[in-house]
Amino acid sequence: MKIAFCLFKYSPYSGLSLDFGRILEECLNRGHSAHVFVSEWQGEHPEGAQFTVLESPKISLKFSNHAQNEQFHNKLQVELKKQAFDVVVGFNKMPGLDLYYGADSCYVGDKVPQYPAIYKLTRRYKGRYSFEEAVFGVKSQTLILSLSERQKSEYQEYY
């Protein structure tokens, strides 16, 4: 299989990145072809996979995390159209994934209640909500690998 792995940022000290690394290594050991797309990579590149770093502009009016994630996703969609992948695996919530490795908590259930109701009018909320809904919403075709039953239940409560 030709697999596209998508992850906003890789750091050798992040639990999500370590999980990603183990999954990538296992896929390569089983003979699959892997292409990794990230916006930022810290550390060594594992052998056997192709890497594309889709950087955000260094000086940009869109410097916030949610805006950078949207820029990454837009660039990623262009790259994915250039090649035919059998499966697109995401380690962060974003539209267009075939498979999502669920390591993050539910944004709508966990983070949003911490803010006043007006927060839902912000670009940050709209961006993060749309990415989460693309994975967990009723119309989504994304397969989800959930890390725990509690996490699964939380997403089911909101989606």
Question: Where do the protein language model's features map onto the residues?
Answer:
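Conserved acidic residues
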Residues: 86, 98, 142
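N-terminal strand-loop element at the rim of the active site
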Residues: 7-13, 26-64, 79, 151
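Membrane-proximal helix-turn-helix segments that form the acceptor-binding/catalytic region
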Residues: 124-152, 158-159
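An amphipathic, basic-hydrophobic alpha-helix
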Residues: 60-88, 126-134
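Extreme N-terminal starter segment of soluble prokaryotic enzymes
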Residues: 1-3
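Short His-centered aromatic/hydrophobic patch
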Residues: 90-94, 102-104
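Conserved alpha-helical elements of sugar-nucleotide-dependent glycosyltransferases
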Residues: 15-23
